A protein has these predicted regions:
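Macromolecular interaction modules
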Residues: 1-102
Length: 102
């Protein structure tokens, strides 16, 4: 099992439209990725230890069986999915692929 984590850093002047993201963008992502997408979790950053601000305003974890399954599902739709990002944020997302160990 792998997780593709999409992270939106908390930055000065950053904006994020949660209504569009949750009601339009994420349903589109789910539809495009189809059965290859095993689960998805979205989190809103609320803070860090010591009362500091969250490092990321939002993170999305998308779960797939393996990297080839992700690449096969995402590849044909990458331009459309990533092209939708400016409709809900001016923050450049950071993406990382993690392998589940435990």
């Amino acid at each position: 099992m792998i997780r593709v984590i999409v992270m939106y850093p908390n930055k000065a002047g950053g904006t994020f439209n949660y209504d569009y993201y949750l009601k339009t963008h994420m349903p589109m992502v789910k539809q495009k990725l189809g059965a290859a997408l095993k689960d998805v979790r979205v989190f809103k950053g609320v803070g860090a230890p010591g009362g500091k601000p969250a490092g990321f305003v939002t993170t999305a974890s998308l779960f797939f069986d393996d990297v080839p399954a992700f690449e096969k599902a995402f590849g044909p739709h990458a331009a459309e999915i990533m092209g939708d990002v400016p409709k809900f944020t001016n923050i450049e997302p950071q993406v990382q692929i993690d392998e589940r160990l435990l």
